[in-house]
Amino acid sequence: MKKLATILILCGMLLTSVIPAMGMDYGDYLNSALEFMQDMYYLDMDDEEALKAALKGMFGELDPYSGFYDNQETQMINDSLQGSFVGIGASLEKCDEGVRIVRVYEDSPAERAGLRDGDIILAVDGVSTFGKEPSAVAAEIRGEEGTSVTLTIQRPTGRLDIAVQRGLVEINPVSWRIEEDVAYIHIESFTSNTSGSFQKAMDEIERRGITKILLDLRDNPGGYVDEAVAVARKIVPEGLITKLDFKSERLSDKEYYSDLKNSPYLLAVLVNENTASAAEILAGAIQDSGKGVLIGQKTYGKGVVQNMFYVLTPEAYAKYGKKYGLHYITSVEWLSYEGVLLDPDDLLGTIKLTTGHYLTRNGRAIQGVGLAPDIEIADRTLPNGIDLALINPLKNTATLTLDAYGDDVCQAEKILRAAGYFNGTPDRRMDQETQEAIRKFQAENRIPATGDIDAQTRDKLNERLDALRAEYDPAYMRGLSLLKSF
């Protein structure tokens, strides 16, 4: 209920008191169309199913970004944009024995309980996972915050039961590292916690006196405009960031500004054809400000914005209409105009609607056009599915041996997979498959084939990482080289 109230207030702030006159009344016509669909369609559907189908068709045909979503679909959208969810914090994949954990999220209930990448889940609360899809197992693991689930785990050392208390899982959309005098920052998407995570990176960057930033926005689909603006305000000098221009008089146009004086940062921004929406707002603000260059391919060109509107059930629509003598279909209208906060049971789902477009600092409209890079260069390729830019160089000081566990093991497996030595899924455990790949790598590089990652093997793996980036990610290398030249 608290999340719903917050979303409604945020939407309500956009609505003004201007209510345009209604057009033609299609009430009887639409009712007849719904009755015809229910009668003639070969499968049975109740009134609510028919209404949802009609709404999906009505809004889904407007453009690729608009649509109607029922309450379950709405929750999934909200979870993805919030950057957090209630669960244990583990990604799963199918394997012969059941389901394998391929990633345990940092500081998650799963990590605190002692689960590890590579653990095989044999049972959930005593119920076997054999033959089940990962999505089905994930549904069995999910539950209310504060409750517990017991997972039967298979490891090389044996079988054990681990009880995990479900809780809030935060997904960090920002990753970063320092390479000599350059900070590399990758933003995956603009969820509700992006700017906070970005600030943590900036705190360390400022502490170390670094002013050169390689910002990776490739494949970033966008997200919350406010979050992209908040990031821009930390690195873009004072002036307009973007302007939102809405068609409806009930939505107030909005301009976002940066107040940052004398920005010290020199920026190289990696973009490609999948850099879209809010990511283009940030990239456009950097380009127009003259504080950075775009490197890569022309961006996607999504220069329009959407709003989410909760819509009432027909029963709630009739109930509130009778009580107030008004006919609003969305909860944000009831909140903005009448101060009525609806109960979640009154809601059928949400309409995501394209309501306007945005302009860059210099007044560019990029819908269907995109942002042209200052330096056009071929996009990266992902050898064996590995994004080389996201690999951190190995830093281990102690030799990593069989059953070693940690981030360095995961990074080594990614390098080995990209180079064709390792066929498994990179995780944080060094098992026999990992060691066999290391032995092949060591033998080809004239290193004693122990299967362990000692200092010599570590350095050779880091050298291979540099060589792979040069071969497969020219945009990354160009950005890094450009910044280091200053």
Cite the ranges covered by each PLM segment.
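Sec-dependent N-terminal signal peptides of Gram-positive bacterial secreted proteins and lipoproteins
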Residues: M1-G23
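PDZ/PDZ-like domain micro-motif
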Residues: D25, E106-D119, N172-P173, D408, ...
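Extended, small/polar residue-biased N-terminal targeting/export presequences
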Residues: M40-R100, S148-V164, P173, D473-M477, ...
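A short glycine-leucine-enriched loop at secondary-structure breakpoints
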Residues: P109-I120, R142-E144, A285, A418, ...
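Conserved PDZ fold ligand-binding element
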Residues: A110-K132, I213-D216, A437-I447
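C-terminal, low-ordered peptide segments at domain boundaries
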Residues: L122-I210, D253, Q367-A398, L465, ...
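Conserved acidic, small-residue-rich alpha-beta core segments centered on
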Residues: R207-L214, N220-G385
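Short acidic, glycine/serine/threonine-rich helix-capping segments at coil-helix boundaries
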Residues: T399-L465
